[in-house]
Amino acid sequence: DAVRWAKSDLELFAPTVELHRLIRENSKDETEYKRFVDSLKASVLTAFYTPKEITDTIADVLADYSVRPARMLEPSAGVGVFVDSMLRHSPNADVMAFEKDLLTGTILRHLYPDQKMRTCGFEKIERPFNNYFDLAVSNIPFGDIAVFDAEFQRSDSFGRRSAQKTIHNYFFLKGLDAVRDGGIVAFITSQGVLNSTKTSVRNELFSQANLVSAIRLPNNLFTDNA
């Protein structure tokens, strides 16, 4: 009901109604429709989708340095813009991608039916995929969102245990776990990873990997894709 909407949000009313119509028409029943909607609501704070120009540029730079992975990981895939950009240069790559939002994950699976597209959180990745991938690339979620990981919780490293408190720190360390020795982690993330006054996670990162490059992007770069 548009009457209940704030005047500043009214321009979003019609697209929202259309989205609900499409979800309802493509859900097998009311229960599935509600699951899709609830999943969308749960992802609102972390769903910042990446402009294609950014993913293409990162893929091009990696290719210029002869980074053409046979095994690629995308831990927060959205609808697969990074997957698409990377497959232009490495069409035969085996890709494993994670997308926690139910609706977005369903779209992702339909777009890439021949790849391993998983509709669940990155924390669900299994131990056999440690030291497995040549490249992990993503615009990872960020913020003070906790992630529980039993392996991290049992770790002797304070940095690994504390990384569970902020999702971007967790994704970095979990991504490093997943790539092989000599592999590359290429993530877009918030300033908190480098700027935080707490150093335990950074120390853990630098104990496991060498920093190849870090580029600061404008803080409004993803506003139109939020």
What is the predicted function of each stretch?
Residues 90, 114-115, 152-156, 202-205:
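Glycine-rich, phosphate-binding/catalytic loops in enzymes
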Residues 118-122, 215-216:
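Short loop/edge segments at beta-strand edges and connector loops
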Residues 58, 100-102, 163-221:
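Conserved Class I SAM-dependent methyltransferase catalytic core
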Residues 45-46, 156-164:
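Glycine-rich phosphate-binding "P-loop"
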